[in-house]
């Protein structure tokens, strides 16, 4: 029997506002525990929440970027549950009137494009953070309590873990472009839960789902779904029954582990938040927010292909993150050739960042520096090989490419007379290589070029070297 995998994702995104959603408490990450709280966050008797308009603007902006319909009437509700990191014993969220719904984004996997539906996007407040010491007690930090969140619930439209990974990558990219969140999973500003079930191919009814938690990276989302997919298939093929469970992904064993069995759906006893009035969003407000949405990744990707002549793959990689795309834009605006800028960013720059586990903002390289270096290559002042030495200096220490070239004596040798003299000396000392080349051994020319580059410390103009070398060989 063959099975079809059904995957849906719930993503929580922390909004980058200066204050919390219902209080004036600050939102800075990394502050000392319990130093960014207020009586409103902690639910003291008699205090009243005040809605942060910027959080509403950010939620609308994200919803619009995700092609959602924006509600004209929306409201907040109390979601009732008790947990130590929830001091009010309820969370202010949205139940039946979310701020956005019926959206979609387009992903691409294996060259195939697919539209993934978004059921809803709603606003809510975050809970505090519990730390379990393992010594008989737990600690709670309420700094996170009351931070503004949007929850983005997808339709169960994904059929493979690869599609789930692509969805998350695209979702993160769009949200980052809007500027409403930095989407840093390591800081908790983007969190994801996954729901997965299997059903026989051709069957319309969904199978029993498992919910996966503790997914701390997009890679873990994919790996957790892959394991769960295999686990459920094995269970069904052996005649077993899938129970509705909450499971967590264990990074060490690369398996999902049972947390609890769900006998029914959670009953949070939602009811309208009595301390907040309904919110009415008119067309003028919507248009103001819509006008603030910048160029999004798909539009940039199309522009890079149409106007800059980049291959679709290059355009895709460059627009994955706004940081990289903005860096590319500034590099080209500084006068660098678009394709050369793309090659350097996708090659040397990404390789360095991946190796050092850094982001562009963490290195000394600037768009202006990269642009000037590329223009030195285009002018023939330095070769691509020498440029790598300049690049290493720029990304580690910064500086002006022209000054680095002069200080290190890296100017490319393009004087024909100087190069011809060096070529002649190399040929005089390598008669056998000349003979090998004339006998059809093409590798011999590579050896000779290598000797010339060694003699010039890599500073010889490669095209000119090849030209002179062939001329001098043909004379012999």
UniProtKB/Swiss-Prot annotation:
<dbReference type="GO" id="GO:0050566">
    <property type="term" value="F:asparaginyl-tRNA synthase (glutamine-hydrolyzing) activity"/>
</dbReference>
<protein>
    <recommendedName>
        <fullName>Aspartyl/glutamyl-tRNA(Asn/Gln) amidotransferase subunit B</fullName>
        <ecNumber>6.3.5.-</ecNumber>
    </recommendedName>
</protein>
<keyword id="KW-0067">ATP-binding</keyword>
<comment type="function">
    <text>Allows the formation of correctly charged Asn-tRNA(Asn) or Gln-tRNA(Gln) through the transamidation of misacylated Asp-tRNA(Asn) or Glu-tRNA(Gln) in organisms which lack either or both of asparaginyl-tRNA or glutaminyl-tRNA synthetases. The reaction takes place in the presence of glutamine and ATP through an activated phospho-Asp-tRNA(Asn) or phospho-Glu-tRNA(Gln).</text>
</comment>
<dbReference type="GO" id="GO:0006412">
    <property type="term" value="P:translation"/>
</dbReference>
<dbReference type="InterPro" id="IPR017959">
    <property type="entry name" value="Asn/Gln-tRNA_amidoTrfase_suB/E"/>
</dbReference>
<dbReference type="InterPro" id="IPR018027">
    <property type="entry name" value="Asn/Gln_amidotransferase"/>
</dbReference>
<keyword id="KW-0648">Protein biosynthesis</keyword>
<dbReference type="InterPro" id="IPR014746">
    <property type="entry name" value="Gln_synth/guanido_kin_cat_dom"/>
</dbReference>
<keyword id="KW-0436">Ligase</keyword>
<keyword id="KW-0547">Nucleotide-binding</keyword>
<dbReference type="GO" id="GO:0070681">
    <property type="term" value="P:glutaminyl-tRNAGln biosynthesis via transamidation"/>
</dbReference>
<dbReference type="GO" id="GO:0005524">
    <property type="term" value="F:ATP binding"/>
</dbReference>
<dbReference type="GO" id="GO:0050567">
    <property type="term" value="F:glutaminyl-tRNA synthase (glutamine-hydrolyzing) activity"/>
</dbReference>
<dbReference type="InterPro" id="IPR006075">
    <property type="entry name" value="Asn/Gln-tRNA_Trfase_suB/E_cat"/>
</dbReference>
<dbReference type="InterPro" id="IPR003789">
    <property type="entry name" value="Asn/Gln_tRNA_amidoTrase-B-like"/>
</dbReference>
<dbReference type="InterPro" id="IPR023168">
    <property type="entry name" value="GatB_Yqey_C_2"/>
</dbReference>
<comment type="similarity">
    <text>Belongs to the GatB/GatE family. GatB subfamily.</text>
</comment>
<dbReference type="InterPro" id="IPR017958">
    <property type="entry name" value="Gln-tRNA_amidoTrfase_suB_CS"/>
</dbReference>
<comment type="subunit">
    <text>Heterotrimer of A, B and C subunits.</text>
</comment>
<dbReference type="InterPro" id="IPR042114">
    <property type="entry name" value="GatB_C_1"/>
</dbReference>
<dbReference type="InterPro" id="IPR004413">
    <property type="entry name" value="GatB"/>
</dbReference>
<dbReference type="Pfam" id="PF02637">
    <property type="entry name" value="GatB_Yqey"/>
</dbReference>
<dbReference type="Pfam" id="PF02934">
    <property type="entry name" value="GatB_N"/>
</dbReference>
